[in-house]
């Protein structure tokens, strides 16, 4: 059944760049002990046991080759592993098609000698062998075609999958069919977006504008039908939600877009998803929603991902709030952003913290600063303010080093090694800033005089 593909794999297995020197360059097997055992497919006795052990070993070698990105070697192992489709063990025989598809598609995606025809041929054969995996394979095949810019072929593939049925429809089949339909919707959205771009270049009084508008409306109706069912099912459907919201907004259905995004973010049936809150926030921002509403959305995002890039925007909203609780949270948000290693070089975060520390202390809220510092005093000095980081930061970005030095001085006192190192540096442009920083640290530091760190 897989003989044609097996031959193709054999060719791929020998497709090294240097066929004369590569140990995997020939079209024959190079593992005689493996070939001998695998070809001994019988129904009982020692050989049956040997077959199971050998195919298991073959799978391990195959996985190892994939992990090392040895695509030609993996193709050769796959050529052998195909024999497991004839395994006498029912469970292994049923599991084989899915394993072969997952590993085989990975090989064909990356193999230097593979092409669309080879991949498609493999996908079509696997659909017929692993009927229970038909929808998954069809969907992944369509995504592969999309990756290669073959939109019409991908759409045709999805249309065939949409009408496919096998036995009684299970719950998992139902979700996969919805997913197939939704991806069709994404393709339709792509066509709709292109028409939208073309429409923006036409005069509204032009006949072509009216005709294209009607065409777009028809396209959006199809897209809605295909996407709607899926996004009502609990799950993470970011690209589908974004596409649908874009169309709702374009046609002026703000209420529909708001309801969809609110449900996507807050419905307890859906898994926790930071992006759902991001999309809702961005929509409300476009609507010019009140600050309190924006804060309430970002507050939940902050609880899920305290290092999210929107946290600096969240801080700005909190800082401008008239509520003391919000302004206090604004300080905590900055500290929490800088708790993460990926944010240590974020100069905007350090600028915001330096400025807000000074403002907070000027407004006599020293206890806010001390509360945040209490849980960090044992690890932030080494994490942010060591002598090593002082030299490294100054060399890489003097402006960043100045902002950090001010924060270090406020939190650790003027005896802090980071602060002292930056203070001694000679920089024509930053000379005045460093002088002002020295005065501010002396005035606002939360450390008692004489304490050195």
UniProtKB/Swiss-Prot annotation:
Keyword terms, alphabetized: DNA-binding, Nucleus, Transcription, Transcription regulation
Location of the region described as Disordered in the Swiss-Prot/TrEMBL record: 1-22
Gene Ontology biological process terms from the UniProt entry: transcription by RNA polymerase I
Xref: PANTHER family: TATA BOX-BINDING PROTEIN ASSOCIATED FACTOR RNA POLYMERASE I SUBUNIT A, TATA BOX-BINDING PROTEIN-ASSOCIATED FACTOR RNA POLYMERASE I SUBUNIT A
Role according to the record: Component of the transcription factor SL1/TIF-IB complex, which is involved in the assembly of the PIC (pre-initiation complex) during RNA polymerase I-dependent transcription. The rate of PIC formation probably is primarily dependent on the rate of association of SL1/TIF-IB with the rDNA promoter. SL1/TIF-IB is involved in stabilization of nucleolar transcription factor 1/UBTF on rDNA. Formation of SL1/TIF-IB excludes the association of TBP with TFIID subunits.
Gene coding for it: Taf1a
Keyword Zinc: no
Name of the protein: TATA box-binding protein-associated factor RNA polymerase I subunit A
Localization per record: Nucleus, Nucleolus
Subunit and partners: Component of the transcription factor SL1/TIF-IB complex, composed of TBP and at least TAF1A, TAF1B, TAF1C and TAF1D. In the complex interacts directly with TBP, TAF1A and TAF1B. Interaction of the SL1/TIF-IB subunits with TBP excludes interaction of TBP with the transcription factor IID (TFIID) subunits. Interacts with UBFT. Interacts with CEBPA (isoform 1 and isoform 4). Part of Pol I pre-initiation complex (PIC), in which Pol I core assembles with RRN3 and promoter-bound UTBF and SL1/TIF-IB complex.
A molecular function GO annotation: DNA binding
CC terms in the record's Gene Ontology section: microtubule cytoskeleton; nucleoplasm; RNA polymerase transcription factor SL1 complex
Any Pfam family hit: TAF1_subA
């Amino acid at each position: 059944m897989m003989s044609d593909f097996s031959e193709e794999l054999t060719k791929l297995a020998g497709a090294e760049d240097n066929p004369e020197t590569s140990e995997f360059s020939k079209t024959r097997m190079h593992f005689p002990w493996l070939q001998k055992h695998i070809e001994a497919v019988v129904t009982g006795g020692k050989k049956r046991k040997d077959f199971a052990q050998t195919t298991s070993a073959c799978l391990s070698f195959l996985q190892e080759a994939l992990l090392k990105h040895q695509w030609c070697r993996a193709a050769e192992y796959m050529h052998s592993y195909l024999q497991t489709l004839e395994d006498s063990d029912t469970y292994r025989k049923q599991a084989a098609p899915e394993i072969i598809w997952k590993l085989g598609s990975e090989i064909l995606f990356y193999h230097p000698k593979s092409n669309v025809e080879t991949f498609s041929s493999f996908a079509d054969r696997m659909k017929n062998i692993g009927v229970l995996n038909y929808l998954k394979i069809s969907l992944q095949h369509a995504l592969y075609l999309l990756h290669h810019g073959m939109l019409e072929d991908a759409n045709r593939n999805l249309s065939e999958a949409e009408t496919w049925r096998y036995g009684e429809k299970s719950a998992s089949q139902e979700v996969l069919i919805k997913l197939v339909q939704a991806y069709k919707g994404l393709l339709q959205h792509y066509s709709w977006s292109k028409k939208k771009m073309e429409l923006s270049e036409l005069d509204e009084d032009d006949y072509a504008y009216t005709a294209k508008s009607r065409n777009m409306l028809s396209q959006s109706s199809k897209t809605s039908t295909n996407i709607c069912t899926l996004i009502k099912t609990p799950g993470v459907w970011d690209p589908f939600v974004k596409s649908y919201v874009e169309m709702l907004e374009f046609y002026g259905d703000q209420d529909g877009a708001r309801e969809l995004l609110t449900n996507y973010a807050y419905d307890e049936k859906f898994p926790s998803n930071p992006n759902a809150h991001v999309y809702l926030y961005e929509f409300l921002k476009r609507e010019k929603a009140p600050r309190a509403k924006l804060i309430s959305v970002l507050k939940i995002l902050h609880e899920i991902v305290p290092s999210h890039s929107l946290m600096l925007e969240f801080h700005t909203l909190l800082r401008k709030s008239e509520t003391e609780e919000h302004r206090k949270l604004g300080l905590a948000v900055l500290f929490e952003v800088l708790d993460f290693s990926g944010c240590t070089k974020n100069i905007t975060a350090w600028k915001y913290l330096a400025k807000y520390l000074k403002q907070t202390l000027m407004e006599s809220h020293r206890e806010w600063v001390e509360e945040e510092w209490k849980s960090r005093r044992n690890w932030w000095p080494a994490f942010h303010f060591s002598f090593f980081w002082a030299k490294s930061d100054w060399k890489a970005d003097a402006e960043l080093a100045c902002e950090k030095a001010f924060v270090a001085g406020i939190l650790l006192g003027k005896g802090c090694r980071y602060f002292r190192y930056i203070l001694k540096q000679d920089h024509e442009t930053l000379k005045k800033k460093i002088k002002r920083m020295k005065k501010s640290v002396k005035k606002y530091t939360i450390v008692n005089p004489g304490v050195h760190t």
